Structures are given as C-alpha cells and as structure tokens.
Amino acid sequence: MKKQPKMTAIALILSGISGLAYGHGYVSAVENGVAEGRVTLCKFAANGTGEKNTHCGAIQYEPQSVEGPDGFPVTGPRDGKIASAESALAAALDEQTADRWVKRPIQAGPQTFEWTFTANHVTKDWKYYITKPNWNPNQPLSRDAFDLNPFCVVEGNMVQPPKRVSHECIVPEREGYQVILAVWDVGDTAASFYNVIDVKFDGNGPVLPDWNPAGQIIPSMDLSIGDTVYTRVFDNEGENPAYRTELKIDSETLTKANQWSYALATKINQTQKQQRAGQLNGDQFVPVYGTNPIYLKEGSGLKSVEIGYQIEAPQPEYSLTVSGLAKEYEIGEQPIQLDLTLEAQGEMSAELTVYNHHQKPLASWSQAMTDGELKSVTLELSEAKAGHHMLVSRIKDRDGNLQDQQTLDFMLVEPQTPPTPGDYDFVFPNGLKEYVAGTKVLASDGAIYQCKPWPYSGYCQQWTSNATQYQPGTGSHWEMAWDKR
C-alpha cells in the first residue's frame, strides 16, 4: 500500500506560481552592479537599455540555477560547457560567437559586481576571471580562453551572505568584447554556480558621439503574413506616434524572426533622422539578422524605444493547474506515488518530471491535452531517499515550442516513532534563544534533533518564520546546525 501524504494537498496554478525556492543565485545589476550575467539577461531586461538575450532555452525561467561541479579551473565544468556549468537546463548558454549575446559596457579599473540570491547558501568564496586579450570570441569558451588567475577573490568566510551582495573589484585593461566568468563556490555542497558576463570595453557613455542606446529589436518570435511589427518611441510626454516605424509582414520570408528584425532595422535607418538601428561597426550602424540595438540622437528629446506587434491571429493562452501535490511524503516499504490531477487551458503537450536535489530524474510523464481537459496522473518514484525533491512541469504547444516551465518543491521524510516526553528539551521553535550546543528539540517532522557543538551551535538560534534554512529536519541547510538523534 502506498504511503499517504502527511499534509493536506494543495492546488497550484503553474502558469503563475512556483514552489519554495531552493536555488540559488545570479549576477545582477539591480542596485550597484556594473553588468548583468548572460543568463540574467535571458529573463530580465538590461538596466537602462532594455536589451535581452533570446533563444536561451529553459534556463530563462530559472536564471538562478546555473550550477555545476566546483573546483574551477582544476576541475569544474568541461571546456565548451563553462557557460552552462554542464547543466542540460542551461545548454543554450554554451553557444559562443562575437554577435550572439548582448554586451554590457564596462571600463577597466574599480567596478562593482552584484549577485542576487534566491537561496543564500553558506559561502566559501567568489572568484572572477576574464578572457585573455587575444581570445577568440567565435570558439566555445574554454580554459585556454581565460586568464586562469582570478582578478578578484572575495572570501565568504563560511557564512550566509545577504540576499543581494556587492563586490568591489579592479577590472584589468582589455579592449572590445570580453567575457567575465563569475564563480560562486558554496560552502555546504560540492557544487558552484557559474555566471558568464558579456562585456564591451571603452565606455559607459554613448557608443558614438551624439547617439545614446535606447532600446532593442529582439527577434523573439516568428510572425505570420498580415501581422505588423512596429517601434514605440517615447519622449518626456509619453509615446510619440510621429516617430513610429511600421513593418508589414507581407511575405513568407519576412515571417522569420531574424528576417523581420533585419528589415525593421533597415527601415528605421532609411526613414528616421533621429533614430538608428543595428550593430555598431566603426562609425556605422549595420542591421544584422539577429538582435539590433536602437539608438536615439542626442538632443532629439526622445527617450526610449520599445517594440510592438499587431497580430492578426490572436495568440493562444496556456496554463496548467496541478492539484494533489503534498509538501511531504513519508518513506515506507512501497514506492512513493504522487497522485496528481491536471487541468489544461489551451491545446498543449504537458510534461512532468520528478528530480531529487541532485537533479537525478526519478519519474516522468508526458501526454497531449486538450483545452479544458481534466486528467489524473500517478507518478511512481524510482527511489526514495529523505530530502528535497522537485516536480518540474513543462507546457509546450503542438509545434513543440516551450510555453512555460515551473518547479514545485516537496520533501521525502523518514517514518518517525513518536518520542516520549523527556527525550527533548523544547518543541521547536519554543525557547529559541536558549538553544546551545547539545540542546535537543522536537521538530515538525516528529524527530528529535540535537544542536551541534561550537562553532556550529550559533546556527541553531538562526530562525524566523521567513528564514527557515536552519529549521531542523526541513530547512535547506539544517545539517549545518543539527544532528538527528
């Protein structure tokens, strides 16, 4: 007989809700950072210009999860897999050409790098590497491309950093396009997080005198004949239609994303005096079959440019409702089974995969679903070991294009024999400030945990309802503070 969940199951709409965040962090530029990481720009627009990376694959939904083996450069990700950290989720990041990724301006000398954490692990250190002056940007990233002496090392001192942290570093002299590799070595696992940062030296100001970056044409999707793509140009008063450039999709060739991006950039350069579009080549703006930055003339009074679409055929909406997933399942003699109910909105292919914390797949299911269909699904796990697990859902349209991906977290726990009074000192978190080395508590999973000796005993008191990483038995880092009795 299968084990029943210990807690009441809850329903979650995957299109808008994700589970508890167990991992982990990415290079950002929210407050002080000089440049965002490659993976960050897959999900978030660049600060100041609105530029984004495209065609990143599933990692665009989880930029915090570029995690791989630690020990770089002696060990760590293989050459050619450095940007992805050998994660299949991030494989698209390993593509490397001179014009593939958005580049952020930077200058040599003192600069600030910023990390944003979704789970702020105990940290060993952060290291920053940069490509050699003569590196080849059209070859996969390898150790030979980098100066393997880090230009900046920040000690983590085996403590948790805040959810956002800044590092002051001295960036070496370079010219043109370079890649910075930021490595966050966490202290409580055998893994590190790898973020590459695409930068261009020589300027935080305008790329040409009198021209300022103001937007980007991102070839994010194919269009259909009859659709229109256009610029939305803004001044101090808001959108100014007088500066709009429209491109009607009137041929099969123009339906392809890279084709209409090139054509729209070309039309801007032909028809607008205060706007230019394309990659900078010397003193010229050259449209490309890919992402085209947009620039505005200094003194024009124009502030920014966005891209709009007039779609003749409305785009379908997709969502998947999953109910029946519990927060905890107790391990027993029979395999663990997840009894789920799915409800589809839109014609889709729904995929479910269960992973343990080490990313090993334990169960999977996929099937086409029609709009409004209800389906009962049972996933039987191939193994059951106590700890954190994830249910990953993917929604694809009938052409196989990924529409959404979400991750929900749950725990597998060992069966517990109820302890007798006197076997423990407190019911956690009662008496929190009295916890010292050797204190025994009864945790929410029904087990007894003993506070570790110094220097780890201080973690036992580090708990609030909003910071539960050291909560005995269920926190993401409980083993740093407690021994299970």
Curated annotation (Swiss-Prot):
Q: Which domain of life is it from?
A: Bacteria
Q: Which CDD domains match?
A: LPMO_AA10 (cd21177)
Residue ranges of domain Chitin-binding type-3 in the record: 437-478
What Gene Ontology terms describe what this protein does at the molecular function level? chitin binding
Leader peptide range in chain numbering: 1-23
Q: What is its main location?
A: secreted
| Chitin-binding type-4 domain residues | 24-201
Pfam family of the protein (one): GbpA_2
| Residue ranges that the Swiss-Prot or TrEMBL entry lists as coiled coil | none
Write down any Gene Ontology CC term.
Answer: extracellular region
Q: Does the keyword Transferase apply?
A: no
Similarity section = Belongs to the GbpA family.
Task performed by this protein: Probably interacts with GlcNAc residues. May promote attachment to both epithelial cell surfaces and chitin.
Entries under PANTHER family matching the protein: CHITIN-BINDING TYPE-4 DOMAIN-CONTAINING PROTEIN, GLCNAC-BINDING PROTEIN A
Q: What is this protein called?
A: GlcNAc-binding protein A
The source organism is Vibrio cholerae serotype O1 (strain ATCC 39541 / Classical Ogawa 395 / O395)
Gene that this polypeptide is encoded by: gbpA
